[in-house]
Structures are given as C-alpha cells and as structure tokens.
Amino acid sequence: MPLPLPVLGSWRHAYASLQPAVTRGSSRLPVAALDLLIVGLTLAVLWLLWTRRATVRVLPLAIAVVVIAALGWLLFLTLWGWNYQVPTLEARLDLKPSELAAGPGETFARATVAQLNALHDEAHASAWPSRADLPRVLGPVMARTLPTLGIAATPLWPVPRRTMLDWYFRAAGIDGMTNPFGLEILLNSRVLPLELPALAAHEYAHLAGFADEADASVVAWLACQSGSPALRYSSALAVLPHLLTGLPRQTQRAVIDGVGKGPRRDLRAIAARLAEQRPWVHAFAWQTYDRFLRANRVAEGVARYDAVARVLIGAADPATGTLRRSPRPWPPSH
C-alpha cells in the first residue's frame, strides 16, 4: 500500500511523535506486548470456535480470517510498517561502483580486524553493559548519530525484553526483533554480553524509523563507533562477517588470519551460540522473513543484511567511525 510522498512524510512525523508514548506504554506491561497479543488472539480464536462450534461454516470463517489478517496488516503499516517505503541509506548515498570494488572491501575488513585486535583488552577490562543499562549507554550515541542521518526527533529507548518465543529465537538463529505492534525490543536470551550493544543499537535503529536491515546495521555501527571501547568492539564484531561475505575466498582467509587470539575466542563463542539453532527451524524462519521483506518491496529479501557492507565500504571511514559524506535529505526539499 504505497503512500504518496507528502502523506508518507506526514506519517513519519506522526510516527516520531507517537513512538515514545507507545513504547512507554508497552514498557509498563508485566510481560512483552507481543506475548500478550499472541496469547490474547489465541484465546479469542479458541473461544469463538468453541462457542460457535455447532454453527461454524467454512466460507464465513474464511472471510473472517481474511478480514482479520487485512486489519492486522493495516495496523502493522500504520504503527511502523510504512517506514519500509523510505529510501535506504544506500540509495541516498549514491554509491558508485568504483567505491564497492574488492580493494576497498579488503581495506575496510582489515581495518575492522585491526580495531578488534587493538580494542579487545580494553573492551574486556570492565563489565559489559547489562540489558537494563542499554538505554542509558546507547541513548547518547544514538542521539549524536541520528541527526546526521536526517532523524531530528529522539526516540524513547526501551530496555530490551525477553519473550515467550525465546525458544523459537534460539532454534531459528534469531538474535532479536522490533515488535511493530508495541514498538518494543525483544532479544534472544542467549545473546552474549559482548554482542548486546551492537544488537540493541540495531533494534533501536529500527525504532528510529530505519526499517531496512542494512540501514539499521549501519546506524548501529555509526552509533557504537562514537562510544566507548566496548561499544566500538561490539560493533566491529557485528559487521566483520558481513564484510567478509563479499570478498574472494582467498582474501577472506588472509583477513581472518590477522584476527588476534582474543577476538578469535569471541568469534568462536558467537559461533558456538549460533550452533544451537535447528537447521529446519532456521530455514523456515528465514524463508518466511524473506517473503515478508519482499512483500514490503525489499527486492533482495534477507540478503539486505549483507548490504551493510556495501554502505560501509562505499561511504564510511573505518579510522573515524563516520560517513565520508552525508546522505541526501529525505523527504527531499522543494
């Protein structure tokens, strides 16, 4: 359901104004809003089927299901989903093919490895931020980063919550999600402390209106790179696999050989956590999400996760942790 540009711009302003109230409300609930929604809908369906079991007709039931699904989709779009229609940072940065060659990609990957090696001891010297600490720790760096990307309003940052779907998150290899119906952040309970800052910043970027997965990862990297050694280290760990994906196999091995013992242990710990996933559940989850993204006009589907490498290689400076140029303003001025 594409919106005309003026309407989409007005909706974005309305979203920025309403997000703090919706997030504040969901944060006051005793459990995740998504859990309450799932339980409530399940009980309502069971109750209706039971009370009307003698008069259930297939056609009216099918029509009711379609109507409820359509209303749910419209609610999704209204609360958050129209953010998918905003041009991505990749499009707004007007990246050139010469900026995305293997040479710059290898340079950025090696710089990321060098940062991991340099920051490892300092990042591990003190305790990693807890989930309860994340709004306080990430709030200032997000507030510095968002205006440079065209977001004037500062969202309300909630404490990431656990969900009753945690077993599914672990089996499917899902690290976290933003609940569009409650504008809350839900994270996998098994995510390692050193992964939390970058992961939470990624989900906070979604709350700020960056629906695109690559955009959210770019925002998370930029925000964390302006923070403490722990934040910079976490963000470097998060983007390294994406940076390696686009490199030739021999170059990948050469870059990985440069990873020091400390960061190598951390990467192995992350790999061990991800090994807990069940392949068939992971395949089902990612195929479903791929269809969802394509339904929202994201042509690459889940491959958009790796597009973060294109944006960083083409427009970011690994030495300063900033973009070399600003993205085109959106909505465009007239």
Features from the language model and the residues they span:
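Post-HExxH zinc-binding segment in Zn-dependent metallohydrolases
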Residues: 105, 112, 211-253
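Membrane-embedded alpha-helical segments of integral membrane proteins
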Residues: 1-51
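Active-site recognition of the HExxH zinc-binding catalytic motif
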Residues: 30, 196-222
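Auxiliary, metal-adjacent structural segments of Zn-dependent hydrolase domains
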Residues: 123-189, 193
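Short extracytoplasmic
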Residues: 29-32, 101-124
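Pan-zinc metallopeptidase signature
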Residues: 261-334
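Transmembrane alpha-helices and immediately adjacent membrane-cytoplasm interface residues
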Residues: 43-50, 55-90
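Alpha-helical transmembrane signal-anchor/signal-peptide segments
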Residues: 7, 11, 81-104
